[in-house]
UniProtKB/Swiss-Prot annotation:
CDD domains attached to this UniProt entry: PBP2_Chlorocatechol (cd08446)
UniProt name for this protein: HTH-type transcriptional regulator TfdS
Residue span(s) of domain HTH lysR-type: 1-58
Pfam entry (one): LysR_substrate
Swiss-Prot/TrEMBL GO biological process terms: catabolic process
Residue ranges of the annotated DNA-binding region, renumbered to this chain: 18-37
Family affiliation: Belongs to the LysR transcriptional regulatory family.
SUPFAM superfamilies (UniProt xref): Periplasmic binding protein-like II, Winged helix' DNA-binding domain
GO molecular function annotations of the record: DNA binding; DNA-binding transcription factor activity
Keyword tags: Activator, Aromatic hydrocarbons catabolism, Cytoplasm, DNA-binding, Plasmid, Repressor, Transcription, Transcription regulation
Function noted in UniProt: Involved in the regulation of 3-chlorocatechol degradation. Transcriptional regulator of tfdB expression. Acts as a repressor in the absence of its effector (either 2-cis-chlorodiene lactone or chloromaleylacetate) but acts as an activator when its effector is present.
Localization of this protein: Cytoplasm
GO cellular component, one term: cytoplasm
Amino acid sequence: MEFRQLRYFVAAAEEGNVGAAARRLHISQPPVTRQIHALEQHLGVLLFERSARGVQLTPAGAAFLEDARRMLELGRTSVDRSRAASRGEIGQLDIGYLGTAIYQTVPALLHAFTQAVPGATLSLALMPKVRQIEALRAGTIHLGVGRFYPQEPGITVEHLHYERLYIAAGSSIARQLRQDPTLLRLKSESLVLFPKEGRPSFADEVIALMRRAGVEPRVTAIVEDVNAALGLVAAGAGVTLVPASVAAIRRPFVRTMEMADASAKVPVSLTYLTDSRVPVLRAFLDVARRGKGQK
């Protein structure tokens, strides 16, 4: 049974005449007659009572007409869905993320993508950078979002944008730093950095930034994550540096101020298999790059 047989049958049933069906289909009458006969032979039933005035559905034909319409609609829908999938307009995108990217970058990306591609679905999983790389290679995620990914063969790391750095300090220390929020000014401050795992990391970048500015950092602690660092800062154990997305969230007993140094910024990056041809990933990257161009 072929889709063209179904189309010819439905047209003849709706027109009540094979010649009229042929004109509607923009073909000659003999192919329509032949294909309807072939369909009847395949089904083993007569679909039409034929007369000089035209054709009339038999009970079997009337029952089959509704099924034929549904099959044709399903065929059209299947074609549309397969074409949409090939363009990345539908399908599931699996994303791994780590760290402070979840505060602003990930929500902004997901919002932009779902607005642009409403037929796609998204899943998020918190995972360390090493696990993200493993998951990319295993095909369990399509994309990683984070910072400071190591260079790996077959893996692309694409910087999406840079975030300014802010000093986070307790209220009394913040008053002293506010007049000169620079890397050089931090040389006498106790630094609480994060994260402890996943090197190279944000902590390594802060240390490198300070050394490039001619400052040897006084690191008193490297803790698990940003929340632990801010907890120590609130307790007066030192100061820390955080991206703008973290500074935007108010916390008790912690004050933030943007750093004056032009170099005080860190990237947010996307990572994915270099040779990936997953359409929904390509659609996501297109949306992300358009957003990058608008910043």
